[in-house]
Amino acid sequence: MAITDGEASHPGMDRAAAGQLAERRAAETSTALSRLGAAAEIVRLRIPDTGVSRREPEVREALRELVSGFQLCLAPWDGDLHADHEAAGRAARGACAAAGTGLLSYPIWTWHWSHPGDPRVPWEAAARVPLSAEATRRKRAAIGCFASQLRPRGPQRPPVLPPEVVAHFIRDHEMLIS
């Protein structure tokens, strides 16, 4: 599920440009999923970027319907220190509890503010999941599909995700929090 389309990541965009960015992000997501080898249908909620917490009950209900009947859901960690990630994580936690579906969470921005042993991170509930060489290759190819976030937007406009940030995402393992 894509809760938002990330259309607010580029400050100063007008409504038309933000709409175009949302469609570009949706296309990038589809391409990335194919690079991963996933044939999943993407459910787009189109919640406004930066507005997930204001619509959290709606997100929780949509997720509950989606995860019902599944054994496991992966969602952003609700302690990530990014408002939309945290709201998505809380909504997933509530949806999974209501549906009887297991939940594992993944940190996204955590890598930028935490350090080993950081007491804000539940390390005791975390597991390092190694990826095969093929999975790592596919993951890197999928990340490369997000040109709207990886490329500079002009001479004075750096990418949303500079190389030092992307380095956190292209590792040969994932960390999941139970």
Model-based region annotation:
Residues L150-S178:
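C-terminal and late-domain segments of enzyme folds
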Residues A2, R46, G51, T110, ...:
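Residue-level preference for alpha-helix termini and adjacent loops
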Residues M1-S105, A141-C145, R157-H168:
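Active-site beta-strand->loop->alpha-helix modules in alpha/beta enzyme cores, enriched
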Residues A97-R120:
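Short, flexible loop segments at boundaries between secondary-structure elements
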Residues S114-R157:
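A conserved mid-domain beta-alpha-beta active-site/ligand-binding segment of alpha/beta enzyme cores
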